[in-house]
Amino acid sequence: MATFFPGESHTFSEYLLVPGYSSSECIPNNVSLKTPLTRFKRGEKPAITLNIPMVSAIMQSVSGVDMGVALATEGGMSFIYGSQTPESEAAMVKAVKDHKAGFVESDSTLTPKMTMSEVMALKEKTGHSTMPVTDDGTPRGKLLGIVTSRDYRPSRDDHSALVETFMTPREKLIVGDKNITLKKANDVIWENKLNALPVVDDYDHLIGIVFRKDYDSHKTNPNELLDSNKRYMVGAGINTRDYAERVPLLVEAGADVLCIDSSEGFSEWQKRTIEWVRANYGEDVKVGAGNVVDAEGFRFLADCGADFIKVGIGGGSICITRETKGIGRGQATALIDVCRARDEYYEETGVYVPVCSDGGIVYDYHMTLALAMGADFMMLGRYFARFDESPTERVNVNGQYMKEYWGEGSARARNWQRYDLGGAAKLSFVEGVDSYVPYAGSLKDGVCLLYTSDAADDPEIV
């Protein structure tokens, strides 16, 4: 017979914050949102500390290279999705680690034979008005020219005109060489009154572009999450099947932390995965685990050696695990229970294992609630899927710009080894749906507004 939990199971929406006393010192600038990402012993410091308590979900529709760079710039961390081949995931991790701050790889690249109408469509799709022209249309092709909004007039010009007829050709461009520093690139931009500076290699292949508009942003990112080599930090998702093949590639690519991505974390399969990582890498490779919804699940994974533990089953906005399997728990109740277990575990063992609240965030204030309930940080899917930096298309739905968003348990994500219990057999069990989320512009604007709000709160919970 099943065990019945006494009391009710609550979601975040059933709680409110009672504002506490605000002194003259209680201002956002005096608040630090730094939080541990990985386990540590009493008296020691964690190996990895987040500068803001936010990480992006291990999802195809959320966490790609652009999200990895953008979120690390703001002090959080992105977990590259594992529902792809080990080689392609490792390549994404490497791209984030190799990213040179300020040098942007174009995702709006043209060929000379494209038409003005295609340029306009690409501008509408990406929002970018500066587009390099390369011989093969790739971001690393040979640079032939550049197109900006000043090179054509849609209201007067022939929309069938070829790019090669109105682009600014290579011989008229000022470019930077592959060894140029960001400071020097910005100097060239200002001295020559440029809006953008293409950077090329010895063979004139495009490496990236430095934009004038980014100059100030690089001076106003004190929260950047960097490793000891001043590279952006990034995480990566793994599963309980191919870890022996995947983990070495991710470690070689430079992943700072791994996380087992599963809808059910209280399992022998997660234990085996963590044990394999420890046997092959010791404590050098950090690995989080989950998801669980009670104290027993937390203690199991903590004893297995998980560096952090995710809480939440079925609470995601596009997750239907509760409807299809009948398992889960109200996110607020689960979080309170697990955080209490974390504190008890720390008192008993002297080891602090951070808790990540994963799912159940419907409104922004729910994040403040999650932190007030004890979460060390939050993993967010829908919230980050709305921004420019998520990997999905921006589309127009009934006159409103939206971004595509789908769950890792959906048919679209192909159930890529996540929603199972491990072992050799593969299941095809739909636990997520496809959807759209309202487009919200750049991540920087949204996150800055949010963590300023979180820092201003000094609540009690009712």
Give, region by region, the residue ranges found by the protein language model.
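Hydrophobic faces of well-ordered beta-strands that scaffold small-molecule active sites
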Residues: M54-A57, S78-I80, Y232-I238, L258, ...
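Glycine-rich phosphate-binding active-site loops on the catalytic face of alpha/beta enzymes
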Residues: F79-T85, S262-G265, V311-K325, L369, ...
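Active-site-adjacent beta->alpha loops and helix N-cap segments on the catalytic face
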Residues: P86-M92, R212-N223, A244, E264-Y281, ...
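Bateman/CBS regulatory modules and CBS-like beta-alpha motifs in cytosolic regions of diverse proteins
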Residues: I27-L50, A57-M59, S88-H128, V133-D136, ...
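Single conserved hydrophobic/aromatic residue that forms the stacking wall/gate
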Residues: Y451, A455-V462
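N-terminal capping/small domains of soluble enzymes
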Residues: M1-S117, K125, G423-S453
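Alpha/beta catalytic cores of nucleotide-metabolism and tRNA/nucleoside-modifying enzymes
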Residues: M1-S24, S108-T111, G176-D177, K183-D187, ...
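Short beta->alpha transition motifs characteristic of CBS
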Residues: I80-T85, K142-D158, L194, P198, ...
